[in-house]
Amino acid sequence: MSAVAPDGRKMLRLEVRNSQTPIERKPEWIKTRAKMGPEYKQLQQLVKGEGLHTVCQEAGCPNIFECWEDREATFLIGGDQCTRRCDFCQIDTGKPQALDRDEPRRVGESVVTMDLNYATITGVARDDLEDGGAWLYAETVRQIHTLTAEREAGATKVELLIPDFNAEPEQLAEVFSSRPEVLAHNVETVPRIFKRIRPGFRYERSLEVITRAREAGLITKSNLILGMGETREEVSEALQDLYDAGCELITITQYLRPSVRHHPVERWVKPHEFVELKDEADAIGYSGVMSGPLVRSSYRAGRLFQQAMEARGVAAAGSAQAAQAV
């Protein structure tokens, strides 16, 4: 077994240990069928013809057909090297390139070209930057809102999936000031195994980020990945923790191992458990829940946003105002 990662660097001890376990065979329910509707086909041709880049196609997301049919897509900002390492994430850890200050404009132009209804922006942790990359995240939201302001179908909604910025008040304030429609920060796993799976993050700090976003008036969202060593009871506790912290939207998914260097799959969660977890999250009080083996944090993101708006009474208030104006 080679002790060298694909990018040529020496593998970490954890990666060497992980690589002793072969890639697991997926159960029969971990599969999807391609349903290529007209909107998907149009976007596929557009992305290819314009040389655009989205996480959707580059990561081989199984939900691309559904999301693109809704004119939703996800973009990665900040480069392809993260300053932190999570044991489930396919983005590599290393020294990032210099900050590309034109990236927000280019992402905004891509959103315009694709005529998206909803864009999810995610990115790498940039602890090498003085502001942790806060300006980059915020400016990308601002560019999308500005460039799509005159869009016939309405300005593109933006979901911003952020690292924790070490919960630094100034950095979070910069990000929150851009007013994304949804502010997402993914906790991903439960407290007992959190440090092992996400050594660069802290569970309580992640909850704090969600709380601060909610206090800033933003719709909040998080994600839990199952199959990395958690127990069923711990998942229930994490769902309650997130809700108590102010989380309104939640996605729950099965861990799929990116390579032998990553954490082995410890269990395959059966479909009925995902249904049970959705019912449980609904009962706790979440405004919107997506739970399933192939759900990803940006899956049906626009629909979850609408559910959160309805739960807040925004849609009802808007209808009442329209009726009064007639």
From Swiss-Prot:
Cofactor(s) listed in the protein's UniProt record: [4Fe-4S] cluster
Gene Ontology CC: cytoplasm
Similarity remark: Belongs to the radical SAM superfamily. Lipoyl synthase family.
Protein location: Cytoplasm
CDD domains per record: Radical_SAM
Gene designation per UniProt: lipA
Upper lineage: Bacteria, Bacillati, Actinomycetota, Actinomycetes, Kitasatosporales
Record's keyword annotation contains Signal: no
Residue sites binding [4Fe-4S] cluster 1 per the record: 56, 61, 67, 298
E.C. designation(s): 2.8.1.8
This protein's name: Lipoyl synthase
GO MF terms, alphabetically ordered: 4 iron, 4 sulfur cluster binding; lipoate synthase activity; metal ion binding
Enzyme class: transferase
Protein's pathway: Protein modification; protein lipoylation via endogenous pathway; protein N(6)-(lipoyl)lysine from octanoyl-[acyl-carrier-protein]: step 2/2
Cofactor descriptive note: Binds 2 [4Fe-4S] clusters per subunit. One cluster is coordinated with 3 cysteines and an exchangeable S-adenosyl-L-methionine.
